[in-house]
Amino acid sequence: MSRIGNRPGPNAKSPLREDSMRNIIFLLPAAALLAACGSNSSGGAGTAAQLKIVGSSTVYPFTTAVAEDFQRANPGVSVIVESTGTGAGMKLFCSGVGANTPDLTNASRRIKSSELDDCNQNGVNQVIEFPVGIDGLTVIQASTAQPMKLTLRDLYAALAATPFGKPQTAKTWKDVNPALPATAIRVLGPPPTSGTRDSLNELFLQKGCESDPAMKALKESDSDKHNEVCTKIREDGAFVEAGENDNLLVQKVSADPNALGVLGYSFLDENTDKVRAVELNGMTPDASSITNLSYPGARKIYIYAKGEHIQAKPAIREFLAAYARMTGSGGPLQSRGLVPFAAADAAAAQEQATALKPLDAASLK
């Protein structure tokens, strides 16, 4: 039976804490609850075990699909998957080694050097990185709304707290660009704990900011000031932090023809009857533009495993192998909106899922 949690709302607590277990509904054989975490009597994925996975709301649907399939093939293994956001997931994952910490974490961006340092300081020295595939960060609007076309400069100028180092005065899109409609700026997007927020900063806001040569020069002369000017988002209500529940974000945007939303491509792909993509820099996201990375919001997504747990839980190794089998072109995850890697990158990801080589910190520099 499945032990995969429904995607919790934005205020849901971690299932890794006792006080939140009653807030999340799971279906689970009683025997699995009593199984010893470190038992490996059968020496493989069939061993009674429990895998705990946290992290990105973007990667959540893909990992959930793999977990469902994996549990059907391995009834002795139960899998918990919780959507916490990338940043919160990394914090939990890197908190230490042992039964009360996650075995894996989903991420809609690559792990940061600072996060890997936290892992190491807490005894997590074998962080295994598996690239899942490619996703596209998208800006969406209701399918009933008048289609919008934005540049990254427009988006940055609308959302920045101090666009190009100046006070934010724009109330409507027309204030940003005379060619845009005179509707109030209202964008629903990810909170700071989300990897999608990091991607919004890096892929959209920084690029829009650096369309001004002075901002590129600022990066060289004062990187801290550049980061503040280019990525700090206004807090006057024009940008609304919508939590980690992307399905709820889709519902809110589809009900408001004047609102835009920021989320991963897979949620757009699953809800084309409700929302459409906003054209950015003359491009709309699709499988082709994301695969070849020509779409400005294209990004790799990941799952990370804790190498220290594999001996006690050999099911982790088998779970990653199952994940790798499902990510290929024409595979089950493609039908759920995952954009597979091109052949060379796919082969490298498959090799990593087999080798399980710990991440080299130097590769993050």
PLM feature spans:
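Short, low-complexity disordered leader/linker segments with a strong preference
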Residues: 1-50, 363-364
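Flexible loop/hinge segments at secondary-structure junctions
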Residues: 38-365
